[in-house]
């Protein structure tokens, strides 16, 4: 074994992969190190008490170790294995996993164990990755803080009194706490990118349709997209290459070749962006953004120019209406998708007392007990927006705005290769700070939502600290040009790492139970 357990959990996936292929370390050793790390820092039983990260909802100790031993045996037998074989990974609890609980962070699916794997999970198994368990999330991906999970909040490893972002805060926090080198998230309006921003990690929302949604529990079907999360741009690219591709089980899947995202990341790591035109979105870098966030963003623009990129400012005039349109489209689609959860076939079932209990009574009792406040709020909003007499005024109008936003992006990409902005207007705020002000919470996704409306790919990567907390920079590219994200992201990462003297996450403070 070439590294101690405390060292192994800090290795990135690319380094782990090289060590595994060279026989310097076994998959079982790597997996056990990460399971021990989870046991040490993740929950009340870890010794970390109430300040545990709580990134995971379910940890599959036995299954992960058995899988790792099988990978080691296959490697010893000379079997041909994928580049990430033996590398551990966490999966957001919105993707179905055969034999493992899948709750989507809701009581409504409490105790449900799916009989099948999502296509993304199937691809992970085929590539030889070791699934450690399922990560925490806001209920049915409705939230920006992971405070709306029915199974407890997740804490930000940079400061356990602060949010890790959402809805996929568990996937991001697991990376920042060195509980896993890779995770899978899903992004409906920023649920991969916003948590990445506030935890100092990297997250990518691929082009809509580039990664299969089969087995992804739907929130808003025209917006949802699974994607890769990691601590480095290259690791994110390696995972992206595993999960992307056409899937006949998903009618929205794109039947097109996957861009060479790994090659783009390696090219970008040279730090050379000569000939690349970068657009700064005027509407996403001004009013409403914290001064520290804007300062780190401006410093990043300086680094992009130093790398040889041409940086120009441009306007997307209709993007200011994206947030309002999104919060009509999303609850409308969610109210339809969540109608299937009624306590009849799977998950929670609440039977009222009485001799003659009807199916309707069971549905009412189950949904009242099973859905949390935020889910109920959005179901009611969506049902209203779709109701007779209001459909055209609300949902129909929102879809027209969506088209205008898409056209703005099309026009912008006619003159630049990528667009950049801060990922989030603030750094991570205190747990509970915005629970009673949902509109303020929703505004945290103002920069990420437009990409979902347009179906374009987006990346968040760390660009510095403000008040000791991570700041994220967002890179956007045209549809099916996901490779551009990785070239620009890797170039900026390389320059910033040189400036900082190492990755930003090397500066994450230690706290109770979380030293590595």
UniProtKB/Swiss-Prot annotation:
Key words of the record: ATP-binding, Ligase, Nucleotide-binding, Protein biosynthesis
EC number(s) stated in the UniProt entry for this protein: 6.3.5.7
A cellular-component GO term for this protein: glutamyl-tRNA(Gln) amidotransferase complex
InterPro entries xref list: Amidase, Amidase_CS, Amidase_dom, AS_sf, GatA
Active site (UniProt): 92 (charge relay system), 167 (charge relay system), 191 (acyl-ester intermediate)
Biological-process GO terms, alphabetical: translation
Pfam families membership: Amidase (PF01425)
GO molecular function terms noted in the UniProt entry: ATP binding; glutaminyl-tRNA synthase (glutamine-hydrolyzing) activity
Catalysis performed (reactions): L-glutamyl-tRNA(Gln) + L-glutamine + ATP + H2O = L-glutaminyl-tRNA(Gln) + L-glutamate + ADP + phosphate + H(+)
Family (UniProt): Belongs to the amidase family. GatA subfamily.
Biological function: Allows the formation of correctly charged Gln-tRNA(Gln) through the transamidation of misacylated Glu-tRNA(Gln) in organisms which lack glutaminyl-tRNA synthetase. The reaction takes place in the presence of glutamine and ATP through an activated gamma-phospho-Glu-tRNA(Gln).
Subunit structure: Heterotrimer of A, B and C subunits.
PANTHER family in UniProt: GLUTAMYL-TRNA(GLN) AMIDOTRANSFERASE SUBUNIT A, TRANSAMIDASE
Name by which UniProt lists this protein: Glutamyl-tRNA(Gln) amidotransferase subunit A
Source organism phylogeny: Bacteria, Bacillati, Actinomycetota, Actinomycetes, Kineosporiales
Gene name per UniProt: gatA
